[in-house]
């Protein structure tokens, strides 16, 4: 294991990892309990840039962990999505103009599996979710200028959700994310957080 892998592997321990993160827009109510990060969203929080709506919002809750180059990050999310645009999942961020957020987002009366890739302006790619939206997993890998986003309904099988170009950089910030653009009070629980060097698995390897 080289120096980079040792440094990354040292971030894997759940309890120490939450404390090592740095908040962007820390929520008023949050706590760590038995390796679980629990929080309640503040009023009208969101991440979005320009497309369709014309506004820029950078007020969502994000607990970021800095990496050295490429990485794989994985987290389990529990939340009860009920109102329009309620959302929780994972975020990868280079700066306020370059980022990805992904997770469950409540839209048109149902929870959708969703991703937003922002490079100057945001896109939005929602889709139907066949699992239990109150309990799901996300995994994101960034390596050699490519971002691979996966989700899981059981923590075992990981279908591809998105494959996209993403800037090659010396470091990224990645971690749990949640927002409630239309309200406050969404309770979210994050657990089983893992951060490691890129897994390097074949694109069609769903393990």
Can you say where each PLM-predicted feature lies in the sequence?
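Extracellular glycan-recognition regions
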Residues: 1-207
């Amino acid at each position: 294991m080289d120096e980079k892998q040792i440094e990354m592997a040292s971030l894997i321990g759940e309890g120490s990892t939450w404390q090592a993160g740095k908040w962007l827009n820390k929520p008023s109510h949050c706590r760590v309990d038995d390796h679980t990060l629990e929080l309640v969203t503040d009023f009208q929080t969101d991440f979005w840039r320009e497309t369709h709506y014309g506004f820029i919002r950078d007020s969502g809750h994000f607990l970021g962990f800095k990496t050295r180059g490429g990485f794989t990050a994985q987290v389990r999310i529990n939340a009860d999505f009920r109102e329009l645009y309620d959302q929780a999942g994972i975020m990868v961020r280079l700066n306020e103009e370059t980022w990805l957020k992904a997770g469950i987002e409540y839209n048109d009366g149902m929870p959708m599996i969703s991703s937003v890739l922002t490079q100057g302006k945001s896109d939005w790619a929602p889709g139907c979710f066949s699992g239990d939206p109150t309990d799901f997993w996300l995994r994101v890998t960034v390596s050699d200028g490519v971002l691979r986003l996966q989700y899981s309904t059981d923590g075992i099988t990981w279908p591809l959700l998105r494959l996209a170009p993403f800037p090659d950089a010396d470091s990224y910030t990645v971690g749990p994310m949640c927002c409630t653009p239309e309200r406050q009070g969404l309770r979210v629980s994050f657990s089983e957080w893992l951060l490691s060097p890129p897994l390097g698995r074949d694109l069609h390897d769903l393990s």
